[in-house]
């Protein structure tokens, strides 16, 4: 993923060339080969094993000298997926974690690393090491040029972190992560998404001031308000698309979904609709439950992209004794009768939007 990188992979594999795996460096894995007095080599797991092999060959103990070269780093890293799990021993870790689900990497090492891991895994484990391979784009400057010291166009992430926070930078990069296209990063984009972070925080404060019940479970049988049914159906649709896009690795679509729902649907419209309901005895209890529940579920959708602010709000408002990162998503499927309320509210929004545009 994206599919266009398949051609790059297969082009290299179909035109494969001999590979010299030895390097003359002072770091790396020393080649496990020992040489006898007549330069016969003995490949073994250890010096002791090589000595036993040599003794069997020569009929006596002889002095062995290990090859001074080291393995090419791409050879060593090609074994990474199973060598780190104590292969060739059949350990629990090897059984549990091989093969992996997905590898995330850059296009520039598809051949150097990805293809070689595939080859090694297929040969030694009889199974490829990954189900999916996600090729992420490069981050360039706002003009699309590659960052370099000589050009003076390097964007220091530490500076952005200090000015706008980790969550804002994470969300910005996710929103710009369109498969097949390099990211054109400008500080103004990060600055713009800082407003989104503030919007989430302000929404939480507003709800908390109105004694909203930040709950993780609701009883849909007792829901009567059109505003409640509408926002629940809106959330259901967003959540469905959210999981669909996760399966397709469309992370920019996920960011767009949660951004639009949180800022526009929830904050701009829903909160405005329910402000008076907090003071209405007939509507207050349901409004506090539904608004709190939807906000909590929205935090879950935001958490993979913005872990710090969402975790802080969860611990402060929902449950100080558990972490949001350990919670499960609650996949919803609300009653179809809620669709009538959704159509009704959307019609109101359409009318109000038209009136605003007349100003």
Predicted regions and their residues:
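Short alpha-helical scaffolding segments that buttress acidic/His motifs in well-ordered protein cores
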Residues: 16, 74-78, 110, 118, ...
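Acidic, turn-prone loop/beta-hairpin segments
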Residues: 35-37, 42-43, 64, 141, ...
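Residue patterns forming the tRNA-binding/recognition surfaces of aminoacyl-tRNA synthetases
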Residues: 1-35, 145, 151-196, 201, ...
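Metal-dependent nuclease catalytic cores in nucleic-acid-processing enzymes
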Residues: 110-126, 352-359
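Glycine- and acidic
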Residues: 1-7, 92-106, 153-158, 178-190, ...
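Cys/His-rich finger/ribbon microdomains and the adjacent scaffold used
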Residues: 1-98, 128, 132, 152, ...
């Amino acid at each position: 993923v994206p599919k266009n990188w398949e051609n790059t992979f297969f082009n290299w594999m179909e035109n494969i060339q001999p590979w010299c795996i030895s390097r003359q460096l002072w770091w790396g894995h020393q080649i496990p080969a020992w040489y006898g007095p007549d330069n016969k080599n003995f490949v073994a797991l250890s010096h002791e094993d090589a000595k036993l092999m040599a003794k069997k060959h020569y009929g006596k103990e002889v002095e062995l000298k290990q090859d001074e070269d080291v393995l090419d780093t791409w050879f060593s890293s090609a074994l990474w997926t199973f060598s780190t799990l104590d292969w060739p021993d059949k350990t629990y870790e090897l059984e549990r974690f091989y093969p992996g689900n997905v590898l995330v990497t850059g296009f520039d090492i598809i051949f150097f690393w990805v293809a070689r891991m595939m080859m090694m895994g297929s040969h030694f484990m009889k199974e490829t090491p990954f189900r999916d391979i996600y090729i992420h784009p490069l981050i360039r400057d706002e003009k699309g040029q590659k960052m370099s010291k000589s050009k003076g166009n390097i964007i220091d992430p530490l500076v952005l972190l200090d000015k706008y926070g980790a969550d804002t930078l994470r969300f910005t990069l996710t929103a710009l992560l369109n498969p097949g296209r390099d990211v054109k990063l400008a500080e103004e984009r990060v600055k713009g998404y800082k407003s989104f972070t503030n919007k989430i925080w302000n929404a939480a404060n507003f709800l908390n001031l109105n004694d909203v019940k930040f709950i993780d479970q609701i009883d849909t049988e007792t829901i009567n308000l059109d505003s409640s049914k509408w926002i629940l159906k809106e959330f259901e649709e967003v959540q469905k698309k959210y999981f669909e896009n996760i399966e397709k690795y469309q992370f920019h679509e996920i960011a767009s979904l949660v951004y639009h729902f949180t800022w526009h649907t929830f904050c701009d419209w829903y909160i405005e609709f329910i402000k008076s309901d907090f003071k209405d005895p007939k509507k207050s209890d349901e409004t506090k439950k539904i608004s709190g529940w939807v906000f909590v579920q929205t935090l879950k959708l935001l958490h993979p992209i913005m872990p710090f602010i969402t975790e802080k709000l969860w611990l402060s408002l929902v449950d100080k004794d558990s972490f949001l990162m350990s919670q499960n998503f609650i996949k919803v499927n609300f009653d179809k009768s809620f669709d009538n309320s959704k159509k009704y509210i959307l019609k109101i929004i359409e009318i109000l939007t038209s009136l605003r545009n007349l100003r």
